[in-house]
């Protein structure tokens, strides 16, 4: 992973809490969207790949990733963004912490190994019109493998954090309408 994408400096941040309310002492910044070429590292994949009608995409504005659009369940009903495959440094990491503002809808965090089309995902909920930023802690062990929406099982589909090459976000909550997820940063722990 390039220095622009992954800063190896470790910091302390009292605003990030574990579920048991203890501080996360150290973390590694994976994305903070301040790089000049941050948008070139992401791609959009919407349900139009299967004939759907959802619209979605992303912009980097004021050093934040904004994933927005509108889902249409008359078709696939999803929109997603993810990083292009690259060498992410998740070896010896347990998961990620994401600082975001949402819209009350449920999103999915997505991780992929190599150039695989198998996605490992987990849902996270957002508050509608939040005044403050939210954080969510996602343990890699909580991600479930799937391929084109079908659940997969077996050892060959287990997630190996050291082999994660792409991360992203998806909205597929079986609801029509506009969506917007603002991401301030993504950090690994």
Walk through the language-model features, giving the residues of each:
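Beta-rich carbohydrate-recognition modules and glycan-binding surfaces
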Residues: 7-189
């Amino acid at each position: 992973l390039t220095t622009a994408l992954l800063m190896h400096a470790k910091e302390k941040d009292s605003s990030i809490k574990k579920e048991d309310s203890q501080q996360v002492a150290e973390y590694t910044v994976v994305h903070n969207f301040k790089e000049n070429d941050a948008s070139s590292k992401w791609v959009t994949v919407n349900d139009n790949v299967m004939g759907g009608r959802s619209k979605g995409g992303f912009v980097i504005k004021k050093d934040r990733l904004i994933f927005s659009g509108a889902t249409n369940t008359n078709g696939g009903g999803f929109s997603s963004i993810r990083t292009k495959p690259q060498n992410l440094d998740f070896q010896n990491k347990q998961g990620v912490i994401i600082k975001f503002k949402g819209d009350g809808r449920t999103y999915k965090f997505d991780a992929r190994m190599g150039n695989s089309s198998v996605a490992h995902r987990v849902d996270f909920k957002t508050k509608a019109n939040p005044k403050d930023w939210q954080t969510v802690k996602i343990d890699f062990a909580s991600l479930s493998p799937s391929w084109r929406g079908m659940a997969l099982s077996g050892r060959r589909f287990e997630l190996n954090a050291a082999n994660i090459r792409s991360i992203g976000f998806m909205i597929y909550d079986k609801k029509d309408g506009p969506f917007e997820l603002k991401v301030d940063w993504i950090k690994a722990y």
